[in-house]
Design a protein with these regions (language model features):
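Right-handed parallel beta-helix
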Residues: 129-166
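Membrane-helix boundary connector in multi-pass membrane proteins
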Residues: 190-192
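Fold-core signature of tandem repeat domains
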Residues: 155, 173-175, 212
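Bacterial Sec-dependent N-terminal signal peptides
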Residues: 1-35
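Residue-level detector of intrinsically disordered/flexible regions characterized by low predicted structural confidence
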Residues: 5-10, 14-17, 140, 158, ...
Length: 218
């Protein structure tokens, strides 16, 4: 007669710990992360090509540096990277394909092969321009101007700008600001705006299917 094998409780817990640790280790190393810092002395405009980037976050600081952080995940993550290029006073950021290997035709659509997020910290009072096909955008801080155009994602802005234009197709637009003239219109969605103190700052908010909400910044 075979003796039963008894697994002690502490062994079960230890194995569970090893499994969780292994999974955590795999998740950490499964991502392609990148951080870059550059001087902002000669930069007055940030141009973000957000195509194929799912989440874009921009925040202003009192520092005179630009900090760019990106995380890429997915089957072909190592074949892409966030590229920075300065032309005159403009800094361009985009997700570029950097591999010499071809991606199979059935996986050409980038959202099948990579999930990208981008976080950018910039000095105050710069111009910010963002366009994206799939991305959602969160913006916080003080800007000279803001221009955002999104095909699918939403847009949240908390801060100030001398002028702003935000266009979405399906995504909602939420703005918290003050001392501004607001022109908001959604073709198939709802628009709601708090009464703000009039000023020379003008914001144009447009959406086809998304809702637009404007509140006074506390």
């Amino acid at each position: 007669m075979l003796n039963p094998i008894i697994i002690k409780p502490w062994i079960k817990k230890f194995k569970a710990f090893l499994l969780c640790w292994s999974l955590s280790f795999a998740v950490i190393h499964a991502q392609n992360s990148l951080t870059k810092t550059i001087a902002a002395d000669s930069v007055n405009s940030i141009e973000i090509n957000g195509n194929q980037i799912f989440n874009i976050s921009v925040t202003t600081t009192k520092n005179n540096k630009i900090l760019v952080s990106s995380t890429l995940d997915g089957e072909y993550q190592n074949k892409y990277q966030i590229a920075l290029k300065q032309e005159g006073t403009q800094l361009f950021l985009a997700l570029n394909y950097v591999s010499f290997e071809d991606i199979p035709d059935d996986k050409r659509n980038a959202n099948k092969v990579i999930a990208a997020t981008l976080k950018v910290e910039i000095p105050e009072d710069l111009m910010l321009n963002i366009k994206s096909d799939v991305g959602s955008v969160n913006v916080t801080g003080q800007f000279e101007s803001i221009f955002i155009e999104l095909l699918q994602g939403y847009c949240n802005v908390v801060g100030k700008a001398s002028s702003a234009t935000i266009n979405t197709i399906d995504g909602n637009i939420k703005v918290a600001t003050n001392n501004a003239v607001i022109n908001a219109n959604s073709k198939h969605g709802n628009s709601k705006a708090d009464l703000l103190k009039p000023s020379e700052n003008v914001w144009h908010l447009y959406s086809i299917n998304g809702d637009i909400t404007v509140v006074k910044q506390e």
